[in-house]
Amino acid sequence: MAIIHPKVRGFICTTTHPKGCELNVRDQIEATRKLGVREDGPKKVLVIGASSGYGLAARITAAFGFKADTLGVFFEKPGTETKAGTAGWYNAAAFDKFAKAEGLYSKSINGDAFSDEARAKVIELIKNEMGGKVDLVIYSLASPVRKLPQTGEVIRSALKPIGQPYKSTAIDTNKDTIIEASIEPATEQEIADTVTVMGGQDWQLWIDALAGANVLAEGARTVAFSYIGSDITWPIYWHGALGQAKQDLDETALRLNQKLAGEVKGGANVAVLKSVVTQASSAIPVMPLYLSMVFKIMQEKGVHEGTQDQLDRMYRDRMYRTDGAPAEVDEKGRLRLDDWELRDDVQNACKALWPQVTTENLFELTDYAGYKKQFLNLFGFERADVDYDKDVATDVKFDCVEL
């Protein structure tokens, strides 16, 4: 038991609130339920990177939107009697509790999702507990490091531009001030390493392993999540080292799509999602300012979505349409859920606003207050229905295999 308040260092909140995290998950489940439960979608779903952000939302839509059995893989720190674990641990615990209450199969694996050991355990569980096959594999890993399964070498990714230094207005989120950020370009080695960590190599290893073990159902599909963004963030993102990794993901999708079409009459796509507040996005310089602006503009236009809205739309309007039509894709075969964010009226409003923002008017011209609240929400804080001066149990156990 402990009394827990937020402590923020840099772009990380070092504390988490178990009760707040549970209520966040409950709210996401309720939002999905409101759209109605369908029986005509995925039935057995594997989510790689299932404990927060888009991966968690994908698991929630599968279970509570389509009554699917789910297996989730993630790398989180469990809580102990005296110390809170990571937010993802409590998210996964809450998901498991609510799924089981609904009579759905739910199992989780806590370990390095980049490892062959994790793949072997997943295959074993699919064979022994999930009827032998899965029909949807969601790939949603966001990690700054990857340990290569063959050699054990640890590779790190770099959030850097390519070619020349990147200079831009940004928010110092610790001081709530507008600053000039400058980031030196990535070296060739850093670019290659970023592709190794964040590209499609591991996704390919997962699908190869699952296909090789014959645990992919007829018609099985796989989706990996990506972000492209607008030209406002391109220098650091799409045209930076990370963009090279995401292009590698696109190429991997084309290969996997051919493979699955041939082997199980299935398919593979990259899904390009909108920018949202996640632990991953807050680490990208310039993103907090861009998010604060784009949220305000999209709210004013009535097209703002959170992680759960995006995933509900991906399943319902793209992948599993009630009219049975194939999903709408772009020229690279990608599912585009960033369509509303990239509307000309939204982006032009952002570009007009960008040069006007100063430390003095930051809270007034943008939804930076909303950004900050959502950031703390990720860790279970800033909820009106939680008394943060009360003791809360930190040692939460659930149906999770520790690797």
Curated annotation (Swiss-Prot):
The GO terms describing molecular function are:
enoyl-[acyl-carrier-protein] reductase (NADH) activity; NAD binding; trans-2-enoyl-CoA reductase (NADH) activity
Which residues of this protein are annotated with the site description Plays an important role in discriminating NADH against NADPH?
Answer: E76
Entry-linked Gene3D superfamilies: NAD(P)-binding Rossmann-like Domain
Name the Gene Ontology biological process terms: fatty acid biosynthetic process
Tell me the keywords, alphabetical order.
Answer: Fatty acid biosynthesis, Fatty acid metabolism, Lipid biosynthesis, Lipid metabolism, NAD, Oxidoreductase
| Reactions performed catalytically | a 2,3-saturated acyl-[ACP] + NAD(+) = a (2E)-enoyl-[ACP] + NADH + H(+)
Q: What is this protein called?
A: Enoyl-[acyl-carrier-protein] reductase [NADH]
Q: Which organism is it from?
A: Pseudomonas putida (strain ATCC 47054 / DSM 6125 / CFBP 8728 / NCIMB 11950 / KT2440)
Write the lineage as a comma-separated list.
Answer: Bacteria, Pseudomonadati, Pseudomonadota, Gammaproteobacteria, Pseudomonadales
